[in-house]
Design a protein with these regions (language model features):
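Cationic-aromatic interfacial patches
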Residues: 47-119, 123-126
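Extended, charge-rich intrinsically disordered regulatory tails
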Residues: 272-284, 290-310
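Short, surface-exposed secondary-structure boundary micro-motifs
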Residues: 69, 120, 228-230, 273, ...
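Bacterial N-terminal signal peptides that target proteins for export
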Residues: 6-32
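Zn2+-dependent peptidoglycan hydrolase active-site motif and core
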Residues: 220-261, 286, 291-292
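Short, well-structured beta-strand-loop connectors
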Residues: 216-227, 259-277
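Bacterial N-terminal signal peptides
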Residues: 30-41
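Surface-exposed, glycine-biased beta-strand/turn segments
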Residues: 127-238
């Protein structure tokens, strides 16, 4: 166990305009026609933003994907999606298509979210119903020496930098792989008591795999290694750790490793060996903790494994 931490209304109107035409001055009639017609051309209604939200009815822990389709490529850099007081970047995923990823967590309340989508000089407010999800509760008794372990300043700094990383490129393609072949011992979102005390601001930020010590840990998707940390450097909680940036605000972290096979700056492919299962850091035994982050918040990686996030 670990102690760690998203109509087009195509209206066509026939505008009747009677402009006197003088046979003796064809040029004058053309000028008049242009003058009278100009205001009507300028007043033509703008096309509504085309927005697709998936899943349509998300539950807590899901990633909400908001895809915005544009008509004018010059406006792509101006697309944003706002949820509450948080504005998320929309990255290009196809010509004239941009996507923002909105994380939800077990610490939030279920209910209606109003998403403000802005682009091409227009704004749309969309209502999305986020469903409640019941998360299990565990009681963890940490052995002496583990219960009082605190992260070092360096560890906290590197972890915060990793979660805040934003890369415009999208490195992953298709569903994510399981990083280890062991059985899942702890699912995402579990609430916990530690040594009898409820951690009310805690939820299990990832999935634990009960892999055998030394068993392979592989990259679930393509990305760049942006974090390699070791116990000897002060990673008391994470243990030996690897962080991969999958691009566009999506990242994976792998904790408690016994061995690390990559270095910072390496680009890894899906299924590539990155380390081995261990029990370093704040762990009660050998296992792999896979944390999955979207725009800085821990979300459930299972939907990313089961289908392509649109």
């Amino acid at each position: 166990m670990t102690t760690e931490y998203y109509a087009r209304t195509c209206g066509k109107k026939l505008l009747g305009l009677v402009v006197p035409v003088f046979k003796t001055n064809v040029r004058a009639s053309s000028v008049l026609l242009g003058i009278f017609a100009l205001p009507f051309a300028l007043a033509a209604p703008a096309k509504a933003l085309q927005v697709e939200v998936n899943p349509a009815t998300p539950q807590l822990g899901d990633t909400i994907s908001v895809v915005v389709s544009l008509d004018n490529p010059a406006n792509g850099s101006n697309v944003t999606v706002t949820n509450g007081d948080q504005t998320y970047p929309a990255y290009e995923i196809a010509p004239l298509q941009y996507r923002a990823l909105i994380p939800t967590t077990p610490l939030e309340k279920a209910g209606t979210r109003t998403l403000r989508v802005a682009g091409e000089g227009q704004v749309q407010n969309l209502s999305v119903q986020v469903r409640q999800r019941k998360f299990p509760v565990q009681r963890i008794n940490l052995p002496p020496g583990k219960a009082g372990v605190e992260a070092t300043e360096y560890e906290l700094k590197r972890a915060a930098e990793f979660k805040a990383l934003q890369t415009p490129e999208k490195f992953w393609d298709g569903p994510f792989l399981a990083p280890n072949k062991g059985r899942v011992s702890t699912i995402y979102g579990v609430r916990r008591y530690y040594n009898g005390k409820f951690a009310d601001d805690y939820y299990h930020r990832g999935i634990d795999y009960a892999g055998a010590a030394g068993s392979p840990v592989v990259a679930p998707a393509a990305g760049r290694v942006v974090l390699v940390g070791k116990v000897s450097q002060g990673f008391r909680i994470h243990g030996n750790v690897v962080g991969i940036d999958h691009g566009q605000g999506v990242a994976s972290i792998f904790m408690h490793l016994s061995r690390i096979n990559v270095k910072e700056g390496d680009f890894v492919k899906p299924g590539q060996l990155i380390g081995a299962v261990g029990s370093t850091g704040a762990a009660t035994g050998p296992h792999l903790h896979w944390g999955f982050y979207v725009n800085g918040k821990s979300v459930d990686p299972v939907p990313w494994r089961n289908q392509v996030v649109k």
